[in-house]
Amino acid sequence: MKYFLDSAKIDEIRYAYKYLKIDGITTNPNHIKNSGKSFNTICKELAAEFKDIYFPISIEIDPHLDKAEDMIREGRKYAAMSSNFVIKIACTEQGLIAAEQLEKEGIKTNITLVFSVSQAIQAARIHSTYVSPFIGWKENNGEDGISYLKEIKDIYEKYDYQTEIIAAAVRNGRQIGKLASYGIHITTAGLAVYQESLNHPFTSYGIQKFCRAWEETKQDD
């Protein structure tokens, strides 16, 4: 399983790339806002940061756009900034039309805001490079946010779809483990989620227990 970082903060990205070995980045308008920088500034920083390596970076176009031709135009604009940029487009009819055209032009796309199996099927049928089904938002709404990703994965394998699944809005290590057991290609989460997934109360308990044993053990002079 690949780990993508869901962030637009360059310091977080550098840290996660160096120490957590992330394989890519996903951004969205909320992350751009939280970075305190403009959209264009973030795009330029990310393009420069990874200019010498292949490193997929999902850049979400203006969500106000609701016509395919406008989405295509903006997708081309940002794809021209870096060969690493993947154009992130919401799963609407017009968005899927735009993504299909961009893929035909060799521009990679990521269909986002996916909440159903049928949406994910169409994303694969138009040959989007990635599809991003959301987990956390569905679970916050009282729905099962995990099992439908297994359905998507099974359907993709059955019909030999090549679109890679990015599990989005991942909230904890339990979800990461379950997604890995399903064979989901990629998970994307914030830095804190990955860091917290490395912790366990028994690990902390064990360290404390062994520290006490160490201190109580007679040491050679």
Spans of model-derived segments:
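Active-site beta->alpha loop and helix N-cap motifs at the rims of alpha/beta catalytic domains
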Residues: 2-14, 19-22, 27-94, 98-101, ...
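Glycine- and other small-residue-rich loops at beta-strand/loop junctions that grip anionic moieties
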Residues: 5, 59-60, 88-91, 112, ...
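Catalytic cores of alpha/beta
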Residues: 11-19, 70-74, 98, 116-126, ...
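Glycine-enriched alpha-helix->loop->beta-strand junction motifs that scaffold or abut catalytic
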Residues: 19-24, 81-84, 101-110, 125-132, ...
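Conserved, mostly hydrophobic/aromatic
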Residues: 28, 87, 123, 179, ...
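Glycine-rich phosphate-binding active-site loops on the catalytic face of alpha/beta enzymes
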Residues: 29-33, 113, 129-141, 183-203
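Alpha-helix-loop-beta-strand connector modules within alpha/beta enzyme cores
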Residues: 40-58, 79-80, 96-109, 146-165, ...
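C-terminal alpha-helical cap/extension of soluble enzyme domains
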Residues: 156-221
